[in-house]
Amino acid sequence: MPAHASSAPDRLLDLNDLLRELVSQGYLTQATAEQCLTIRRSAVNNQQHPLEFIASQQLDDLRHPGRKLELEHLTVWLAALANQPYLRIDPLKIDVAAVTPLMSYAFAQRHKILAVAVDKDAVTIASAQPFVHKWESDLAHVLKRPIKRVVANPGDIQRFTVEFFRLAKSVSGANSIDQKLGNFGNFEQLLKLGASDQEPDANDSHIVNIVDWLFQYAFQQRASDIHIEPRREQGSVRFRIDGVLHTVYQFPPQVTMAIVSRLKSLGRMNIAEKRKPQDGRVKTKTPDGGEVELRLSTLPTAFGEKMVM
């Protein structure tokens, strides 16, 4: 299965072709490949990405004894096969606020792609269908810069597409409400802070959704503490991971203030008091269902309250 140039006809990955290539390269036996095809034909969900299906079969990697053909290993293999760079998507290294405006959520979902970097020279797009090019010319024309392609894990592309665009929508919604109100105090009142301590749903406020994302993301990244720091132009959220602080998102200043107020409410702190340091505690659930208690501390600064969790 040779790599295709962008001028070649588009071709979706085919399970039969991929298994044949894995057999020819010594990763699988022919018997195992045929067994996989039989299972696939009888499967209810035939829409699963071929690499995800192969990985789900927990097959032994004959070229690396003792190792399974896991999804990430298969993604690296596919990138080499397509002669495109491989990328393991690290959300800590992606400027979500910069990449989400590059295309609509519908466009990203339709083509199963995700923008992962942008600079003055190019836009880097992750895809798990390296031989499909139909979206490239339209996107390059709209963005007025070349497209640099990378191959990434299809599961990660789907998960982070949903996560990044949901966060961007919440930030945009919260900021637009603030701009309509035109003042910080009314913005915080509108949020009805503390009114939704239950599990967030689609009807919750934008700020509640952002705070919920913040907790989930911190647990996913195994952050030891979270810093929310106001600035004149942009507030920032930073996670400490393995002793190093990483900036994970920058919010408009008014949104940063509202996030801090939401957290103060959850921690049973005095929302109205902004000139004195305060301490509080909040209990929340980890993604695996465990309960954890977070300590909250606020400190007044020239641009609002800084919070450390």
Regions found by a protein language model. Name each.
Residues M1-G304:
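N-terminal, intrinsically disordered, highly charged
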